[in-house]
From Swiss-Prot:
This is UPF0231 protein Sama_0645. HAMAP family: UPF0231 (MF_01053). Disulfide bonds: none annotated. InterPro entries: UPF0231. Coiled coil: none annotated. Belongs to the UPF0231 family.
Length: 124
């Protein structure tokens, strides 16, 4: 899983870009975690608890995207995927799930979060 982090020099906003199959993770990092070290720390704490066997799973529901963790993987998905009545959507308006969800190993997410944490500190 490849990624790159950037900070806008004009307004200070942060963004993340992930490899094609993990694009939604970049949006989750930028939009849900953003420049909030406490949010990143909370997810890292949950990962540590899962790895220590203290938790079996953990979920964080955000405004646009949610994160689910279990003992093996992390899954980020757009909350719009909870839309149950796909029949009401026109053919051209169907939701393209592949761009709206991605999974990776728990250790991969942990490494990306640690890099994000370091990026936030280094670019302040």
């Amino acid at each position: 899983m490849e990624y790159e982090f950037r900070r806008n020099g004009l307004d200070g906003s942060v963004m993340a870009r992930f490899s094609m199959e993990h694009e939604v993770m970049g949006r989750w990092f930028g939009e849900e975690l953003g420049d909030k070290p406490a949010a990143t720390a909370a997810v890292l704490t949950a990962i540590a608890a899962i790895q220590a066997g203290e938790l079996r799973e953990w979920r964080l529901t955000g405004r646009e995207f949610s994160l689910e963790l279990d003992e093996e993987q992390a899954r980020v998905y757009a909350n719009v995927l909870g839309y149950d009545n796909q029949d009401e959507l026109d053919d051209g308006m169907s939701l393209y799930d592949a761009e709206l969800e991605a999974s990776c190993g728990l250790e991969d997410l942990e490494a990306a979060l640690q890099s994000w944490q370091a990026f936030l500190v280094e670019t302040r």
